[in-house]
């Protein structure tokens, strides 16, 4: 199975660089995975697709202002993108500079926001492949420093500096647990009134946590997808969520994941539980689960997701869920119908294709 099987041509003007004025004002493409039929709708029509007793699972991670601008103490500009906070004073980060800092190098960060001479210092203590371990010398915890001097880490394809409005719009309204460097973007379409309408309809709601890493934007750099090594991200699925999933399945209702990160959290927990002969069990660990055509989904019955990059692991996940041909036809239609793509773009609602295992490239 080749990465090129998941290519499609996307005109640049279809990449959404700003969100819609209202969260729910996006369009929605409804794809029935079983029949392959798709239909153009508006996002607020999603309320008609979700039934009483269904369980809607969201990812409650909160994006940290993870991008810092600065310089080496010896001179030379650099950009830091925090990937993971290790403790109150250490983090792993990507560092972009004309020359990579060496072990022991001192970095001065945040002067663009705090003023010249008011930046804070970090020492590069170790390198772990593409990531640099940074130790912050300040008394304040890393999260506090990022809140003061960090920028929202907008994806590279948005191709503009972050603005004040992004601090709100690049977060879901239910985000709670600090740790992501990218938003779980399917959730950006939900506002509080929509959540209240779902609850009033008798739809159950649960939250998992997966801290989305910068690796989600990395291109697949191999020809055969079986050679791809998936990046790891930390995920949590609590006992309470497991109980809700089991209760939903027992009544014949659907488990609906909001976003691919929710899917990966739930299916990681299910995959780990399979060894114990269970459908799903609590999960608190890193996951590098890679779902592509030929892989099965043990728990998730339907999916809300945005439109993803060509040749990305996320369009591979959607193809595994809805069927390869169904997915590529729906994407072709989305391009022709001028849907808006990627993080600030439009959404899909997909019912699982029970025959997806037979629909391979």
UniProtKB/Swiss-Prot annotation:
GO molecular function, one term: S-adenosylmethionine:tRNA ribosyltransferase-isomerase activity
Highest taxon listed in the record's lineage: Bacteria
Subcellular location: Cytoplasm
Pfam family, one: Queuosine_synth
Pathway: tRNA modification; tRNA-queuosine biosynthesis
SUPFAM superfamilies linked: QueA-like (SSF111337)
Class of enzymatic activity (EC top level): transferase
Signal peptide boundaries: none
Keyword Nucleus: no
Recorded catalytic activity of this chain's protein: 7-aminomethyl-7-carbaguanosine(34) in tRNA + S-adenosyl-L-methionine = epoxyqueuosine(34) in tRNA + adenine + L-methionine + 2 H(+)
UniProt keyword Magnesium present: no
Keyword field: Cytoplasm, Queuosine biosynthesis, S-adenosyl-L-methionine, Transferase
Documented EC number(s): 2.4.99.17
Any one cellular-component term (Gene Ontology): cytoplasm
Cross-referenced InterPro entries: QueA, QueA_dom1, QueA_dom2, QueA_sf
Gene Ontology annotations of biological process type: queuosine biosynthetic process; tRNA wobble guanine modification
Function of the molecule: Transfers and isomerizes the ribose moiety from AdoMet to the 7-aminomethyl group of 7-deazaguanine (preQ1-tRNA) to give epoxyqueuosine (oQ-tRNA).
Subunit (UniProt): Monomer.
HAMAP family named in the record: QueA
Family affiliation: Belongs to the QueA family.
Protein name, UniProt field: S-adenosylmethionine:tRNA ribosyltransferase-isomerase
Gene field: queA
């Amino acid at each position: 199975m080749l990465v090129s099987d998941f290519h499609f041509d996307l005109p640049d003007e279809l990449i959404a660089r700003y969100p819609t004025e209202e969260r729910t004002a996006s369009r929605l493409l409804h794809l029935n995975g079983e029949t392959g039929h798709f239909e153009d709708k508006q996002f607020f029509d999603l309320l008609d697709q979700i039934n009483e007793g269904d369980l809607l699972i969201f990812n409650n991670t909160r994006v940290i202002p993870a991008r810092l601008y600065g310089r080496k103490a010896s001179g030379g500009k650099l950009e830091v993108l925090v990937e993971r906070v290790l403790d109150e004073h250490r983090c792993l980060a990507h560092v972009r500079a004309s020359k990579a800092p060496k072990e022991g190098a001192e970095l001065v960060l945040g002067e663009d926001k705090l003023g010249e001479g008011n930046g804070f210092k970090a020492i590069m203590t170790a390198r772990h492949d593409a990531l640099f371990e940074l130790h912050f010398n300040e008394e304040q915890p890393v999260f506090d420093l990022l809140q003061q001097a960090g920028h929202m880490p907008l994806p590279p394809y948005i191709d503009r500096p972050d603005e004040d409005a992004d601090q709100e719009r690049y977060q879901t309204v239910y985000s709670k647990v600090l740790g992501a460097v990218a938003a779980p973007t399917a959730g950006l379409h939900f506002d509080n009134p929509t959540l209240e309408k779902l609850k009033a309809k008798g739809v159950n709601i649960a939250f998992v946590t997966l801290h989305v890493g910068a690796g989600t934007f990395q291109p697949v750099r191999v020809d055969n997808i079986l050679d791809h090594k998936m990046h790891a991200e930390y995920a949590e699925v609590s006992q309470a969520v497991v109980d809700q999933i089991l209760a939903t399945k027992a009544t014949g209702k659907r488990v609906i994941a909001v976003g691919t990160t929710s899917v990966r959290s739930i299916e990681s927990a299910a995959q780990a539980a399979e060894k114990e002969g269970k459908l799903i069990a609590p999960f608190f660990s890193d996951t590098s689960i890679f779902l592509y055509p030929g892989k099965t989904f043990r728990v998730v019955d339907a999916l809300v997701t945005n439109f993803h990059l060509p040749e990305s692991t996320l369009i591979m996940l959607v193809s595994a869920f809805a069927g390869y041909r169904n997915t590529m036809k729906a994407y072709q239609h989305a391009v022709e119908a001028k849907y808006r793509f990627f993080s600030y773009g439009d959404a899909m609602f997909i019912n699982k294709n029970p025959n997806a295992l037979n629909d391979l490239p």
